[in-house]
């Protein structure tokens, strides 16, 4: 199953760093937050990624092209014609398609633009600026069991956008843009989607969190997988610093691939 990651945003609220690189390439513990997200999916056996790039998309492509240089010790032997020797080579079991989905394309438009890379298959989608410790295997199992077109991961947060009204059977009954209460249940990404969802997206200007998700909710085709564990997006410098401190502590909740 392919994993689509939205990685085309500007990240304008995160310090000077976001002026020079795409938001998903902003680093936590020396590695882009995009890498952290991919590591979690990979831990659960999902290694086929489609990155919806946009702003400074060349930086994402160059980072993957030079991945060995980021993760291995190397020797450059100029006496042998600029030969490079990679030591203790570490290769992720990943297949990564980095797709330029446009500079100002909305979230739905970016998903629509990578349809040809997905085909007629169930796929996953998440945002390139949020990490969590959701059990992705259980998320996929839940999606397959209910048989609806879409599942999103829902978490409890204070005063956020994308607020959900959820029924007793976990059906999303309404999708609102603004919270009116603290402790609201919100959309955290980490979605599982059927290919029919592409039909709800009209073009580049479609915001996926508006018309498509609202239509799916109205038709009873949007389910929520309620996650009671850790989730955090990286929208501000304060949130970035908080994630950095968690990583430096050696006990980052989302680092499931290293937990015993």
Predicted regions and their residues:
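Structural beta-sheet core signal
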Residues: 3-5, 51, 125, 150-153, ...
């Amino acid at each position: 199953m392919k994993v689509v990651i939205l990685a085309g945003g500007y990240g304008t609220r995160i310090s000077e760093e976001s002026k020079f690189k795409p938001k998903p390439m902003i680093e936590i513990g020396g590695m882009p937050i995009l890498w952290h997200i991919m590591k979690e999916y990979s831990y659960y056996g999902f290694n086929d990624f489609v990155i919806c790039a946009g702003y400074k998309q060349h930086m994402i492509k160059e980072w993957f092209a030079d991945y060995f240089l980021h993760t291995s010790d190397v020797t450059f032997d100029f006496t042998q014609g600029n030969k490079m020797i990679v030591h203790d080579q570490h290769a992720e079991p990943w297949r990564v398609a980095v797709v330029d989905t446009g500079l100002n394309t909305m979230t739905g438009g970016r998903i629509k633009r990578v349809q040809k890379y997905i085909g007629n298959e169930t796929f996953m989608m998440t945002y390139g600026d949020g990490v969590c410790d959701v059990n992705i295997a259980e998320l996929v199992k839940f999606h397959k069991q209910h048989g609806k077109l879409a599942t999103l991961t829902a978490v409890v947060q204070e005063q956020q956008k994308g607020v959900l009204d959820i029924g007793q059977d976990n059906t999303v009954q309404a999708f609102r843009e603004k919270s009116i209460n603290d402790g609201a249940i919100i959309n955290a990404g980490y979605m599982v989607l059927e290919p029919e969802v592409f039909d709800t997206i009209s073009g580049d200007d479609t915001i996926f969190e508006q018309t498509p998700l609202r239509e799916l909710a109205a038709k009873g085709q949007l389910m929520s997988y309620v996650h009671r564990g850790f989730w955090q997006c990286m929208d501000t410098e304060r949130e970035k610093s908080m994630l950095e401190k968690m990583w430096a502590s050696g006990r980052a909740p989302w680092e499931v691939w290293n937990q015993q």
